[in-house]
């Protein structure tokens, strides 16, 4: 095992039984079939692009946006400065501007998720979207607290299910997710492709997942047809 990550298990067929494949992460959010009027959180909101998808697709009654909001301080984010990325505004100001149409349902929670998430562990969320700091220790912490945030039937979606990004940064999402699925009672319910392979993976507690019914056998169909 590569020492850049802790040892972690591989998934097997039983862990993805019934999971759906989606062309992109927006399709996955829609395809999860969550009811409108729920409660949704996004950990790491950046420039609000996916926040808009979440509120438009899920129509929640409450949306909590967690971030440290320091993006305006970036000196080189893939060739752009924070000043350029956020139109000369502070990160939080930019986000507030972008989310203004939904201000009635949006609650902004500023600060490190290591601390801010702890006040929301009441199992009231229908979905928590995790896209914060991708270093292993941060992902593990966000995931552990997020499991206490979602309802028993709630869904966790992790962005960037990959080990290394195109800038050669090491990500901790795969080890954390795989351990949750193999050792902590979660199952994969969806996987969303991305054109750059920054894919999303959706998890739900195994005891909340409806397993697909087995296809009836020929003998079973004959018995049903004959009333037996």
Show which residues each predicted segment covers.
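N-terminal pre-P-loop "Q-motif" helix
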Residues: 24
